[in-house]
Amino acid sequence: MSGRGKTGGKARAKAKTRSSRAGLQFPVGRVHRLLRKGNYAQRVGAGAPVYLILELAGNAARDNKKTRIIPRHLQL
């Protein structure tokens, strides 16, 4: 009783995380949730957590005098 009729219809696509869409190994969904729960702003855009992660990683790379972001910079 899926409600798609006899032909079957389209099945739902496999879930894809926002981290994989952004090409990051960092939890974009978790950062977004924390931005919303932390009362930083009334509304938080979909790209805000991705930008925040990359901005902080870029700052860490610059502090280490590197021009390329590596996974270690995401952790710092």
From Swiss-Prot:
The modification N6-acetyllysine is found at K6. The modification N6-(2-hydroxyisobutyryl)lysine is found at K6, K10, K37, K65, K66. There is a cross-link at K14, K16 (Glycyl lysine isopeptide (Lys-Gly) (interchain with G-Cter in ubiquitin)). Keywords: Acetylation, Antibiotic, Antimicrobial, Chromosome, Fungicide, Hydroxylation, Immunity, Isopeptide bond, Nucleus, Phosphoprotein, Ubl conjugation. Belongs to the histone H2A family. Residues 1-23 are annotated as: Disordered. InterPro entries: Histone-fold (IPR009072), Histone_H2A (IPR002119), Histone_H2A_CS (IPR032458). One of its GO terms (biological process) is killing of cells of another organism. This is Histone H2A. The modification N-acetylserine is found at S2. Phosphorylation on Ser-2 is enhanced during mitosis. Phosphorylation on Ser-2 directly represses transcription. CDD domains: HFD_H2A. The modification Phosphoserine is found at S2. The keyword Phosphoprotein applies. It comes from Acipenser gueldenstaedtii. The modification N6-succinyllysine is found at K10.
